[in-house]
Amino acid sequence: MDGASAEQDGLQEDRSHSGPSSLPEAPLKPPGPLVPPDQQDKVQCAEVNRASTEGESPDGPGQGGLCQNGPTPPFPDPPSSLDPTTSPVGPDASPGVAGFHDNLRKSQGTSAEGSVRKEALQSLRLSLPMQETQLCSTDSPLPLEKEEQVRLQARKWLEEQLKQYRVKRQQERSSQPATKTRLFSTLDPELMLNPENLPRASTLAMTKEYSFLRTSVPRGPKVGSLGLPAHPREKKTSKSSKIRSLADYRTEDSNAGNSGGNVPAPDSTKGSLKQNRSSAASVVSEISLSPDTDDRLENTSLAGDSVSEVDGNDSDSSSYSSASTRGTYGILSKTVGTQDTPYMVNGQEIPADTLGQFPSIKDVLQAAAAEHQDQGQEVNGEVRSRRDSICSSVSLESSAAETQEEMLQVLKEKMRLEGQLEALSLEASQALKEKAELQAQLAALSTKLQAQVECSHSSQQRQDSLSSEVDTLKQSCWDLERAMTDLQNMLEAKNASLASSNNDLQVAEEQYQRLMAKVEDMQRSMLSKDNTVHDLRQQMTALQSQLQQVQLERTTLTSKLKASQAEISSLQSVRQWYQQQLALAQEARVRLQGEMAHIQVGQMTQAGLLEHLKLENVSLSQQLTETQHRSMKEKGRIAAQLQGIEADMLDQEAAFMQIQEAKTMVEEDLQRRLEEFEGERERLQRMADSAASLEQQLEQVKLTLLQRDQQLEALQQEHLDLMKQLTLTQEALQSREQSLDALQTHYDELQARLGELQGEAASREDTICLLQNEKIILEAALQAAKSGKEELDRGARRLEEGTEETSETLEKLREELAIKSGQVEHLQQETAALKKQMQKIKEQFLQQKVMVEAYRRDATSKDQLISELKATRKRLDSELKELRQELMQVHGEKRTAEAELSRLHREVAQVRQHMADLEGHLQSAQKERDEMETHLQSLQFDKEQMVAVTEANEALKKQIEELQQEARKAITEQKQKMRRLGSDLTSAQKEMKTKHKAYENAVGILSRRLQEALAAKEAADAELGQLRAQGGSSDSSLALHERIQALEAELQAVSHSKTLLEKELQEVIALTSQELEESREKVLELEDELQESRGFRKKIKRLEESNKKLALELEHEKGKLTGLGQSNAALREHNSILETALAKREADLVQLNLQVQAVLQRKEEEDRQMKHLVQALQASLEKEKEKVNSLKEQVAAAKVEAGHNRRHFKAASLELSEVKKELQAKEHLVQKLQAEADDLQIREGKHSQEIAQFQAELAEARAQLQLLQKQLDEQLSKQPVGNQEMENLKWEVDQKEREIQSLKQQLDLTEQQGRKELEGLQQLLQNVKSELEMAQEDLSMTQKDKFMLQAKVSELKNNMKTLLQQNQQLKLDLRRGAAKTRKEPKGEASSSNPATPIKIPDCPVPASLLEELLRPPPAVSKEPLKNLNSCLQQLKQEMDSLQRQMEEHALTVHESLSSWTPLEPATASPVPPGGHAGPRGDPQRHSQSRASKEGPGE
């Protein structure tokens, strides 16, 4: 080819260097406009699309060195269906076929094989441009040296860029999953977060939107591929290209992925239906397929014909045809089977699924923002220049002529291009003939492909046999797993039986050891009894100190409980705050959504306002021109219409640009908002999950609360039963000793409990920290937590009710304890009879205490063992899962190996077929060479004809220019005439208007004067009649006569002036009528002149149209010439390339044979390795199964041990709980036991004497036994004389055996009683726990009651103080009143009724008690639990007594007052005695009534 394609490669290189917004550094200057201005924008859209899909892709034309990085060959040669016309183009290929060349290049082998194959397929690459067409203007081709330099530079640079790019993209994509083929909206939130899930858009879907300029003319070789340089307008389009959808954002590897066969078949077929017929068929016809795919491709070509006929535009889109070849090859490469081939990146195989994926939305938005910033200034400059052109075209008078000249230039370009089209359509028809021949070859090749399908059937049968083997292996695996499960079940059963037998054995051993220990302890206890009494006294003092410590601990626990309640309330307040914050955030989100909608509406309204302002600007300019040239309105209507059309087009362009910019801005804003909303949604999802977990925890807490309530009730019942049993079985000494031991154990337990509570406090602090960390998560869970809070409140109410019930039960228990204490006193009398049993039980209790401690140690050790076993079990489970996954991977690898083997067999057959096809290609290439030589000769003849035509065209040009100059002169003269006529017409109209106005004014003035004169005349006539009447009556008055004469003279003057005015009016009317006739004549003359000028204009238009036709024909001929010259140059270069390709193909055949042999050897080695690997994996699987069985046995044994340990642990915990329960009962007994301690010491002394006697008797019995044994031996040695003594000895021995049996029975009974007592102790411990909790709750309640009662007491004290003061005041008043009454005369006293003596009672409350009451309360004792109830009872008693006393006092005062009030009217003193008492009595009554009301109420 010539240097123009190299320049295109340079432009592609510059574009890929600088990105979509940068211009090439050395742009080509255009020879002239290529298309009319009204089609420039359409061409720009198409070119922009091509620049975005091809120019920016790194897999564009001119790429070499694709050997190292690219798809590994599924078979080591190109597809067998290629003939010479479909070979890929070399480094100087046009951009229109970039994708197809790239596919062919990628289907080649590794770096070692690629160099030879690239040379061998040179002619295939360079013959492809004959199938493509690109319309561009011609420039002089570059020199050959410069062309070679450009080619080399482009090739080197593209090789480097491709290597770097592929490695980088593979590193980025190695971790990403394969893309989904689902179709989604680009605004889907899931796709915003996971952009790799977007469907892959084919380049056809992009070019389809902008293929405005397609033509239905059959095409020959593409102009761009024939060596013509691209029009410089592409530089602008690359700059002003807009991003209209996410498909335009596709990164550089999307083309690589599509060309590699990753484009889905449905997308490709859809795109190919919308191609032009010749561009689709040119590639489809050269690839042999199976009959199904052949029919499909014929259908697609027919659909392409129909689509191209429907789309009736008269130009071409080269980018569209280039995309069509890529899409078509995407289908074909899928049918051949190269879609899933792995890629080579630096020698490593990478699966094809990882290529061709989209970048993230973030990268896309950043790139769009950068491009938008780069393009903003240039786009604004273009818009401003267009606005200036609009204003200038509208405002200037010469705009019509300029637009006509531009139209002429555009039409000339159009005719020249149509000439090129005619020349190229001839070549296209020849290409269609070649297509028919190639289709015949394709039918022949399809038969060969059927033979290949039969071979694939045989390989499929072999694959079926292998799959059956895999199924048998799977069946064996299932059988093994079943056997494993059966063995595991058997092992578990055996282990369980073993464990039960072991447990029985251990129990038997423990019983034996206990019996032996009891026998020994009975001997030891005799000696230790003396020491125990001394120890008991010390333990009593220690127990009192321990009790005080326990009470202190109880107070600390209550304070901790209050602190935890305060923390819970603070957390609830924090939760409410977060709920409010959540509501505020939701409102803010709604507000933001509304603001976004308002912004969008504002943008739309701004766009509408912009358009409206532009239209107003245009309309104002048109009004300005119309006011200046109103007379030229009809003459310039056509020019104004053209100007309006052009202005509308430019306005639409500017508005479209602004809409696009606003659209990109809105899309970016929407993307950002959507990402924010997605973040919020994820956060809310997390919060919902946490809320669900919290709800589950709340449900668990509720369940535990219910269980505890049930346990509490059961324990209360058991407690009652146990108390009944205790009354029957306990003795005073036993209860004392057990209480001492129980207090010791309880002290230990309380210490452990304290440690647990401290641990719980630390865990609560940890949970508080966690809650503070999870504040953000709790925002969404607040709504759910409300319901939880309500349920918790209900639970709290239930707990309060439960606490009330428990407090009642506690009081009942206290009463029962009082009763039982009496029973205990009764039982103390029976201690002497049950001393032996008590000693045995005490020994058993000590043993059980030791056993409990041993159980604890065993439980802790076994817990550790269980945790270790759980960890080992988890580890083994994870190893099992890994082994299973490895087994699945081995099966998958085996299947892939079998599939690879069958694929390689198919590839070998295809390679052989392809070698036969290449020989046929050589022959067809030789035929083409002969045809080209004949075509060259015909082209030389055409060239001579073209020279003659150009000379004739030059002469015609000169004539046309002269005619155009003459027409312009005539048009300017005509314009001047029209202007003059218009100015004359306007001046005449103005004069007419002024004269008409003056005439109307004069007529108005005259009519007013006439009316005035008429009115004066009527007045004068009336006066005259009056005077005449008066004159008739009185003829004597001369003065009246004179006045009448004067009036008549006046009347004559007025009539004279009236006649003058009428004459003037007639003259004015005549003058105005003459002027009107003259103006009408002038207007008629002007209209005649206007008609003449219109006829002259029509003649000028006819001349201009003829000139245009001649110029268009001239340009048409020029276009034909250029098209012929281009095709001539292309054919010459194509001929030379075909000659070089013939030699390279022969060398390529030898290379292909070697590669096939190497591939077969490598495949056999891989098969052998896979077999070895499968065998090794099966062996390792069997070993792992054995390991798993052994581990399962171990796990089963560990489970049995864990169950045993759990039982022991439960028994120990029950014992501990019973011990705790008994603690409170024993606390009440401690004081009584202290009193009984002295009695017990005396009894102990007696008991020790009895024990000493028993021991002495035992020693005597043993000595007698030894003596008897000696005597027996002596008697046996002697004659049997002492048979009687032997019988006596036997009888004594039987008695001893009976005593031993009775002792054993007593031991058994004591064991049973010990067990019962242990159970009772465990239940007592549990009761103690529950009572502790209830006591804590009671403490909180009693504290509240205490505060309330203290407040009431303070009120009562205040009332008492006021009552005392009022009482004293009343007494004083009464004494004064009595003294006054005594002083009055006795006569008055005797005449009045005798006054009853008033007796005011003293205050019933003593002064000492009042002082004590009015004093501040004493300090609270340090033992609140013991003293609270007594304090409360005292307070209640005091309140009741105070209230009763106040009521009695109020009644007495009221009675005394009522008895005293009847005396008041009888007394005639001015100040009666009741005068003082009355007003004071009322407040007294009020205060008394108030006190009486407050008393019961309180």
Swiss-Prot record:
<dbReference type="GO" id="GO:0005829">
    <property type="term" value="C:cytosol"/>
</dbReference>
<feature type="compositionally biased region" description="Low complexity">
    <location>
        <begin position="315"/>
        <end position="324"/>
    </location>
</feature>
<feature type="compositionally biased region" description="Basic and acidic residues">
    <location>
        <begin position="1376"/>
        <end position="1387"/>
    </location>
</feature>
<feature type="region of interest" description="Disordered">
    <location>
        <begin position="216"/>
        <end position="325"/>
    </location>
</feature>
<keyword id="KW-0963">Cytoplasm</keyword>
<feature type="region of interest" description="Disordered">
    <location>
        <begin position="1"/>
        <end position="118"/>
    </location>
</feature>
<dbReference type="GO" id="GO:0005794">
    <property type="term" value="C:Golgi apparatus"/>
</dbReference>
<dbReference type="GO" id="GO:0032580">
    <property type="term" value="C:Golgi cisterna membrane"/>
</dbReference>
<keyword id="KW-0007">Acetylation</keyword>
<feature type="site" description="Cleavage; by caspase-7">
    <location>
        <begin position="311"/>
        <end position="312"/>
    </location>
</feature>
<feature type="coiled-coil region">
    <location>
        <begin position="394"/>
        <end position="1459"/>
    </location>
</feature>
<feature type="modified residue" description="Phosphoserine">
    <location>
        <position position="272"/>
    </location>
</feature>
<feature type="region of interest" description="Golgi-targeting domain">
    <location>
        <begin position="172"/>
        <end position="257"/>
    </location>
</feature>
<feature type="region of interest" description="Disordered">
    <location>
        <begin position="1440"/>
        <end position="1498"/>
    </location>
</feature>
<keyword id="KW-0175">Coiled coil</keyword>
<feature type="modified residue" description="Phosphoserine">
    <location>
        <position position="1392"/>
    </location>
</feature>
<feature type="modified residue" description="Phosphoserine">
    <location>
        <position position="57"/>
    </location>
</feature>
<feature type="compositionally biased region" description="Basic and acidic residues">
    <location>
        <begin position="1440"/>
        <end position="1452"/>
    </location>
</feature>
<feature type="region of interest" description="Disordered">
    <location>
        <begin position="789"/>
        <end position="809"/>
    </location>
</feature>
<dbReference type="GO" id="GO:0005730">
    <property type="term" value="C:nucleolus"/>
</dbReference>
<feature type="modified residue" description="Phosphoserine">
    <location>
        <position position="465"/>
    </location>
</feature>
<feature type="modified residue" description="Phosphoserine">
    <location>
        <position position="385"/>
    </location>
</feature>
<feature type="region of interest" description="Disordered">
    <location>
        <begin position="1376"/>
        <end position="1400"/>
    </location>
</feature>
<keyword id="KW-0333">Golgi apparatus</keyword>
<feature type="modified residue" description="Phosphoserine">
    <location>
        <position position="18"/>
    </location>
</feature>
<keyword id="KW-0597">Phosphoprotein</keyword>
<feature type="site" description="Cleavage; by caspase-2">
    <location>
        <begin position="59"/>
        <end position="60"/>
    </location>
</feature>
<dbReference type="InterPro" id="IPR051841">
    <property type="entry name" value="MT-Golgi_org_protein"/>
</dbReference>
<feature type="region of interest" description="Disordered">
    <location>
        <begin position="974"/>
        <end position="993"/>
    </location>
</feature>
<feature type="compositionally biased region" description="Polar residues">
    <location>
        <begin position="269"/>
        <end position="291"/>
    </location>
</feature>
<protein>
    <recommendedName>
        <fullName>Golgin subfamily A member 3</fullName>
    </recommendedName>
</protein>
<feature type="region of interest" description="Interaction with GOPC">
    <location>
        <begin position="121"/>
        <end position="141"/>
    </location>
</feature>
<comment type="function">
    <text>Golgi auto-antigen; probably involved in maintaining Golgi structure.</text>
</comment>
<keyword id="KW-0472">Membrane</keyword>
<feature type="compositionally biased region" description="Pro residues">
    <location>
        <begin position="27"/>
        <end position="36"/>
    </location>
</feature>
<feature type="modified residue" description="Phosphoserine">
    <location>
        <position position="983"/>
    </location>
</feature>
<dbReference type="GO" id="GO:0000139">
    <property type="term" value="C:Golgi membrane"/>
</dbReference>
<feature type="compositionally biased region" description="Basic and acidic residues">
    <location>
        <begin position="789"/>
        <end position="801"/>
    </location>
</feature>
<feature type="modified residue" description="N-acetylmethionine">
    <location>
        <position position="1"/>
    </location>
</feature>
<comment type="subunit">
    <text>Homodimer. Interacts with GOLGA7. Isoform 1 interacts with GOPC while isoform 3 does not.</text>
</comment>
<feature type="region of interest" description="Disordered">
    <location>
        <begin position="166"/>
        <end position="195"/>
    </location>
</feature>
<dbReference type="GO" id="GO:0005654">
    <property type="term" value="C:nucleoplasm"/>
</dbReference>
